[in-house]
């Protein structure tokens, strides 16, 4: 009888221990993330028409957007500079233009991508030189980890009649955008290399950058001359995942 009693007691203790262990696992905090997908009416209202010389990117003094209360990412930039008023000086503009026509090979199609990713809106990063950069920043001034984002080459960058990626593809060719954080970390995203270019929306892991307050985009490539890159310095981005 004693043996039987001890057996029951031991079984109950093991069950209790197992229950507590499960409880500890359940209390492990789960990672919370926010996704900047540019998909509400506020972003749609910022899509310029026409794509070049439109009222939002060429006739205003500045352009800005923010995703407060969600990812808290934001971007603002001046449209005034030494070349006059317009989107010549770097920045990140909202778009929804899908255009795979290879004859649409000029800057008048600068807000287009050749294919969508299942949603309506995305953003176009443009940064023509080291002096004209595109900057993402957190509006709450706190450092956050950006886990990933999607990238895609634009219609203009791919098919441009002068300096287009498709024209340049060969052994030794390269076109890339580098994302640099305020903490000194950076990541090069290769958009085209040798005979291959990104022509589908592609997910890029940015977690190695660590916690950041700002991200700066700059472009580089092998097709360059005395005045910088010949390749149009554009890339499309979407679905930026931020750890809250």
Cite the ranges covered by each PLM segment:
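Short aromatic-glycine motifs in intrinsically disordered, low-complexity regions
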Residues: 129-140, 228-231
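Extended extracellular/luminal ectodomain segments enriched in beta-structured repeat modules
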Residues: 141-148, 212
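Terminal, low-complexity interaction segments
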Residues: 176-244
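Short beta-strand/loop motifs in extracellular/secreted proteins, especially
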Residues: 134, 147, 173-177
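Short coil-to-beta strand junction motifs in C2/discoidin
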Residues: 160-177
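N-terminal targeting leaders for non-cytosolic proteins
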Residues: 29-131, 141
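Short glycine-rich beta-strand segments
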Residues: 151-154
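Bacterial Sec-dependent N-terminal signal peptides
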Residues: 4-6, 15-45, 244
């Amino acid at each position: 009888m004693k043996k039987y009693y001890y057996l029951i007691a031991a079984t109950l203790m093991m069950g209790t221990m197992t229950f507590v262990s499960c409880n500890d696992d359940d209390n492990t905090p789960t990672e919370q993330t926010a996704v900047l997908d540019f998909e509400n009416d506020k972003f749609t209202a910022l899509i310029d028409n026409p794509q070049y010389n439109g009222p939002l990117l060429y006739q205003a003094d500045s352009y800005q957007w923010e995703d407060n209360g969600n990812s808290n990412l934001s971007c603002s930039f001046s449209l005034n500079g030494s070349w006059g008023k317009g989107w010549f000086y770097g920045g990140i503009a909202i778009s929804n233009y899908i255009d795979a026509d290879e004859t649409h090979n000029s800057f008048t199609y600068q807000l287009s991508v050749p294919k969508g990713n299942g949603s309506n809106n995305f953003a176009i990063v443009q940064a023509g030189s080291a002096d004209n950069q595109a900057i993402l920043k957190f509006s709450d001034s706190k450092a956050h980890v950006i886990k990933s984002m999607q990238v895609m080459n634009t219609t203009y960058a791919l098919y441009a009649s002068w300096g287009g990626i498709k024209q340049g593809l060969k052994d030794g060719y390269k076109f890339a955008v580098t994302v640099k954080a305020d903490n000194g970390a950076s990541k090069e995203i290769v958009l085209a290399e040798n005979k291959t270019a990104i022509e589908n929306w592609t997910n890029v892991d940015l977690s190695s950058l660590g916690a950041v307050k700002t991200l700066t985009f700059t472009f580089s490539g092998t097709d360059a001359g005395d005045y910088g890159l010949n390749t149009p310095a554009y890339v499309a981005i979407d679905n930026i995942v931020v750890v809250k």
